[in-house]
Amino acid sequence: MAMTNQEKFKVLADQIKVSNQLDQTIIEKGELTRVDVSNKNRTWEFQITLPYFLSHEDYLIFTNAITEEFKEIAKVDWHFTIQDTSNQDEHAIKYFGHCIEHTALSPKVKGQLKQKRLIMSGNVLKVMTSNDIERNHFDKVCNGSLVKAFRKCGFDIDKVVFETDDSSSYDDLASLEAHIQEEDEKSAREATEKIEKIKAEKAKQQDNNESNVDKCQIGKPIQIDNIKPIESIIEEEFKVAIEGVIFDINLKELKSGRHIVELKVTDYTDSLVLKMFTRKNKDDLDHFKALSVGKWVRAQGRIEEDTFVRDLVMMMTDIEEIKKTPKQDKAEEKRVEFHLHTSMSQMDGIPNISAYVNQAAKWGHKAIAVTDHNVVQAFPDAHGAAEKNGIKMIYGMEGMLVDDGVPIAYKPTDRDLKEATYVVFDVETTGLSNQYDQIIELAAVKVKDGEIIDKFERFSNPHEKLSETIINLTHITDDMLTDAPEIEEVLTEFKEWVGDAIFVAHNASFDMGFIDTGYERLGFGPSTNGVIDTLELSRTINTEYGKHGLNFLAKKYGVELTQHHRAIYDTESTAYIFIKMVQQMKELGVTNHKDINQKLSNEDAYKRARPTHVTLIVQTQEGLKNLFKIVSASLVKYYYRTPRIPRSLLNEYREGILVGTACDEGELFTAVMQRDQSEVEKIAKYYDFIEVQPPKLYQDLIDRELIRDTETLYEIYERILKAGESTGIPVIATGNAHYLYEHDAIARKILIASQPGNPLNRSTLPEAHFRTTDEMLDEFHFLGEEKAHEIVVKNTNELADRIEKVIPIKDQLFTPRMDGANEEIRELSYTNAKKLYGEDLPQIVIDRLEKELASIIGNGFSVIYLISQRLVKKSLDDGYLVGSRGSVGSSFVATMTEITEVNPLPPHYICPNCKTSEFFDDGSVGSGFDLPDKQCSTCGAELIKEGQDIPFETFLGFKGDKVPDIDLNFSGEYQPNAHNYTKVLFGEDKVFRAGTIGTVAEKTAFGYVKGYLNDQGIHKRGAEIDRLVKGCTGVKRTTGQHPGGIIVVPDYMDIYDFTPIQYPADDQSASWMTTHFDFHSIHDNVLKLDILGHDDPTMIRMLQDLSGIDPKTIPVDDKETMQIFSSPESLGVTEEEILCKTGTFGVPEFGTGFVRQMLEDTKPTTFSELVQISGLSHGTDVWLGNAQELIRSGICDLSSVIGCRDDIMVYLMYAGLEPSMAFKTMESVRKGKGLTEEMIDAMKENNVPDWYLDSCLKIKYMFPKAHAAAYVLMAVRIAYFKVHHPLYYYASYFTIRASDFDLITMIKDKESIKNTVKDMYSRYMDLGKKEKDVLTVLEIMNEMAHRGFRMQPISLEKSQAFDFIIEGDTLIPPFISVPGLGENVAKRIVEAREDGPFLSKEDLNKKAGLSQKIIEYLDDLGSLPNLPDKAQLSIFDM
């Protein structure tokens, strides 16, 4: 009997193993009505009828299962018919994203559609769009594809239509942002619930020991014989097995409680994304949680195209964790690496030092060196890594060594330059080494009395084939040399022809090298003739030239150069150039050959020297400081295109440093190529150790024909080893490592390729991975086993043993000394306290001062306070207020020494006359500024209101021993003065800007990777691109400086006790030097002052200048000012006019859309509530999904929610908790660590409500109350001017805070401005950053216009360069507000008009340098009325 359709469906459900995962009604009543099979296309389409819709999660489970089951037979598809579609509307919305993904729409369109609101109307699905443009676009591109996708899932939908959503036309930006915020909060709440659920499940599993999975194993075992390289996967396949290492993991929970797992793996041939849905009632998730980045897995599954990312992925059916034996160093006796580059070798090294140290330790190496290019910035991390791994760290650097000056004249002779005879010559050779290559052409001209009097030109036969490179360079062919004489004959004839003339050559060291080598081989000995190098001569007498090549000089001197790189032509050109140079020397007072070097030498001679690489290894602690001095001088004093180390500098600070010969660009290696053995050994004696590196690292020299062949390379090794033996200097084999493993080479290639001018781009990069001992021994096998062991193992270990343990970073804080600081801080505190509170101080004041002074003085922090006090006093004396940041306002001593305006005592009254005071220390008042006005009961004077109720512990910790971090906000325009004042206080050599290190960011790395792949014509999957991006990320790219950090070195030490110094980004014109180390590395060793720049003090200063009002006299509780935080009424405008329910546009801290929405939700009326708003807006998970919900639900009001970190400690102490417990709770919550059981118990014992505990558990970061109070104080002062002195406010705002202006709109009437703002609100989601910045300005302009004020056009006669100025009830904008007009041009316009009015647009262009585009803009603005294009010439001007 044939099976029914329902029975068929049950069999299918059992076969694909979903019977226990779907609703039983579905299993019982579902029907498999038909299977359409196409043998030709190998496809099966299942026609299935279901009683009702599957949940979206169950739909994914079912379709994934059916695909997996039959994947080896056919490509599966399906079509559902749903019997009960009554709840179709609900399911359509949930399926919408899935259906979008199963269309051929672009990823961008898919992403846009997913954000849209849906409405089901009968059998029509309406997608609500933001505007008509968007509607038309979707109509065009979707083209019925969505209907098809929905019908496949069983939906009875006839069509999908796109309509403009009226509800999305928000009246103003605030409501738009409110809508977005509401959606974000919903998502955030859902995410939080999921996270808490995961945490709870994880904790439960741990408690019950339910999960013992320590190794991932899902599905069937995978046969190793089936493994394919990932690079071979280029199309969809039914069943593929791969192996790879994980470099990224993503677990995403679905609403059903299941997860989708995404792994990114690589086998270093390519990378691939692996995906799998976890199964219900299985421990799949536990297995996947056992995986981590760096583990190897073997996986099997179907390769299919992910339609969302348009890339191949594997849908896994089976996966197992496998063990891969890591690379090992199996040698019994290990080597020591002495030449290694980390990510601090700018755009060259790949891993950080920790990765190298970890590897060396695993291999059993006892020591490892770090030798980055020109810097020592890896030292701090190297120290930590070495201590952690128990390995000896050897600190070093690969630097650029230069001679202090390169001679212009060699072998000086007493010859008058005018009367001398010169032989100007040039050689063409088979290569660059005078030791291994030969002369093939020798040409010369003889010069006397400024005239060429004779010529010499000969070829010589090298008896070898010329390389293609030499033929192309010299234009000499083998045929031209076949019958040429021997070089011995040519040189003998040449020597006789030259006589005692002075040799002249361009880059004479090269040409003379070949002449001297040839002479010596003939037994003549080196030449005794004097020499002049025209290259070095030009560099000295033509310092204004950036180039000194023969082509360039010929052009500059007006000399014809007919065929460059043929000896005779080069020689004649050089001769004519030299004749003119002799005249230049005469004008400089140089007339004799022996005087050239002395009279033409200068302090910049080091710039002319060719740098050679040198390795500097720190041997002793003294050597570390000396290296810091060398590094500093090279970066500050001797920087020219690259940091340079003059030999004299190295000699001066060589104590405690071992000097090595470095790589193939070192002095010794070059000498072996260019000098005889005696000279090589003479040079070798300068060094403490000689380096040789694996032949593979020199392969590029052979590829570039700098070395003839491998045999020649082996000869070079022999000569180097011989030099070591004859001088007794140890020879060590070093690896010159730039990355850990061979497969990391691609990352270095990408970084090098991103630098077009890098010479390493000229050839194939050598293999520069971190080699094991056996790898190094194998590299040097050609030397024989004994010699290889000597240089690889024996000598490196002996050298390491000669090096002492060195500590590069101090282990304590060294603060500056200021005589009498303790006494002065105490005296200042009490003097100012008595000025405020009277001679008979209240006990609460005394107790607080003594408590704080005990900590400050007892822990040596007085000098830090005193420095800050001096800086603030200087700024105040110069007329600029200073705002405090961070928690310094928690210190009453800081208040009394005038470091901060925030008073942390409990709210209180003070009588300015009789000094009567009244404190409210029961928590009933949030801020003293909120106390009602009151007269003194004793003398009737109006009482001062003060106190923000902030505990001291939030600044220096519960024990008062935390180093104070005093951050100060100076006016941005005054900040440079404050910085420079530290030089007055401590001396110029004791203060430095805090240095930073900029590394390659992920986005930048992505650009490098894409650029490299495009240039190479390579296509890679997204997963492989992600891997390459990770490899490039984090490499040092540049250096910089902290925006306000100043490092202060104590007078009893110098900067080199802590760090080298440099200029930021090596900018030698910078006014400040910075620490070479990133300031975080020495944060605990030296004092850092945070002297930051901020707009608020600048704006306050401008408002004071305009109004004459002292900002300190502004009433903080002014009712009209306070009203703007809940309504625009006190501004004289309505919500409808300014499109906002508050009046805080442009008020610092309260002007953003996010905070304005908070104001609308909370309607604050007091200073303490504004402080709460500030704290809530700066915290993480403090407002959204937390305090906002509590306020909305009516559980508590704004004043009682947790806003700032200090609130927690104060609240809990008032509740009855011990101060220490209250402090610990505050610290735990503010750092996002939640609450411990001990804290929860203490809170419950003191009846702290549950909502308070729940709120604490959600918080990730909290803002300090002192910081919030300081910000709010500035904001209220500025708001006061906005309410009571509007034009002063608007002029100041536009001058100080605004940067992007739409003047064309700003000069219009108020309704036009308002309509422009409304239009931008309607397009807000499509606006770019610049447009949003313009919108912010137009919001304020709209408000200004509705208050009855107007913006004039730019005025050629009245506009200033930078400041908006007031004229009547209008503002006149400055020139800088014109889009595209820079600061220099703005200044130039003002300067030009002082010489008289502009007569025409042409005159404006000529005098002020305005472009035609800007002139047209000014014309459109109405700023050039009656100004003609050109000036008319009057008869009276004739």
UniProtKB/Swiss-Prot annotation:
GO terms for cellular component: cytoplasm. The keyword Zinc does not apply. It is an enzyme of class 2 (transferase). It catalyses: DNA(n) + a 2'-deoxyribonucleoside 5'-triphosphate = DNA(n+1) + diphosphate. Its main location: cytoplasm. Keywords: Cytoplasm, DNA replication, DNA-directed DNA polymerase, Exonuclease, Hydrolase, Nuclease, Nucleotidyltransferase, Transferase. GO terms for molecular function: 3'-5' exonuclease activity; DNA binding; DNA-directed DNA polymerase activity. Its EC number is 2.7.7.7. Residues 422-578 form the Exonuclease domain. Pfam families: DNA_pol3_a_NI, DNA_pol3_a_NII, DNA_pol3_alpha, DNA_pol3_finger, HHH_6, PHP, RNase_T. It is found in: Cytoplasm. InterPro entries: DNA_pol3_alpha_NTPase_dom (IPR011708), DNA_pol3_finger (IPR040982), DNA_PolC-like_N_II (IPR024754), DNA_PolC-type_N_I (IPR028112), DnaE2/DnaE/PolC (IPR004805), DNAPol_HHH (IPR029460), DnaQ (IPR006054), Exonuclease_RNaseT/DNA_pol3 (IPR013520). GO terms for biological process: DNA-templated DNA replication. Required for replicative DNA synthesis. This DNA polymerase also exhibits 3' to 5' exonuclease activity. Belongs to the DNA polymerase type-C family. PolC subfamily. This is DNA polymerase III PolC-type. It comes from Staphylococcus haemolyticus (strain JCSC1435).
